[in-house]
Amino acid sequence: MSSAQLLTAQQLAARLSEPDLLVLDCRFALEDPSYGARVYQENHIPGAHFADLERDLSAPVRKGVTGRHPLPDPAELALKLQAWGLRQDSQVVLYDDGPGAFAARAWWLLHWLGKRDGVYLLDGGLAAWKAAGLALTNGESSLRPGDFQGQPDASLLIDAATLQAQLGQPGLALLDARAQPRFRGEVEPIDPVAGHIPGAQCAAFTDNLGSDGRFLPPEQLHQRFSALLRGRPVDELVAYCGSGVTACHNLFALSLAGFPLPRLYAGSWSEWITDPRRPVATGD
């Protein structure tokens, strides 16, 4: 069974009282890093704990070395997950405002640490919860420490040097989750260099969603990624984006479609461009 699973707002509402349920609010805004904590204090799904992208789901940036959202230290992340109440047998539901990129980053981190069963994204995110007229609260969520012990799986990652050595190999499928204008290098609102890694294809993460903001059916996602793979093996696929966040949305969608989980270049574009010797491409 795929490790990527979805819950509807109504399904989550029916399970909120279950004692083994852990809900994490992953809301964030790249242009306003304090946004997530602020809106969590205003209202959130009852019982949810707040997981901040920069404070909890990333390590500190090392200027000129890392990308904008380096992977967190696995031992530190495991301790935070324990503090929120994660146990080995917990059911976990992750949400953000709706597109799911920040929730997908949390999903990938849990998968990386070995928590692969019973982890769900709220399909449509908080927007779907609100649209269903379900309750929100601004109250404190109770803490009951968990016993989760995670071990990172290095096979899920590829580093910059290894990726650079593989550029140009016919089997490599390199998928960039950013939107077309950033991929082509026409605009770059965040990073100091525009463009993409040579040989990459644009696979905008938003194309995993329907017009209602929910994930496309697995069959449609399978067609999408099969077309992008062009017959290449999925174990040669590498996902990246601007900083290792929206790429996780593509990885979740790949898993939802029934593909085995390929590798993530976690440093992504913002790390790639820290070394001017690495090649850069623009256009299609």
UniProtKB/Swiss-Prot annotation:
Transmembrane segments: none annotated. Gene3D superfamilies: Rhodanese-like domain. Its EC number is 2.8.1.2. Residues 17-138, 168-281 form the Rhodanese domain. One of its GO terms (molecular function) is 3-mercaptopyruvate sulfurtransferase activity. One of its GO terms (cellular component) is cytoplasm. Pfam families: Rhodanese. Keywords: Cytoplasm, Repeat, Transferase. SUPFAM superfamilies: Rhodanese/Cell cycle control phosphatase. It catalyses: 2-oxo-3-sulfanylpropanoate + [thioredoxin]-dithiol = [thioredoxin]-disulfide + hydrogen sulfide + pyruvate + H(+). This is Probable 3-mercaptopyruvate sulfurtransferase. It comes from Pseudomonas aeruginosa (strain ATCC 15692 / DSM 22644 / CIP 104116 / JCM 14847 / LMG 12228 / 1C / PRS 101 / PAO1).
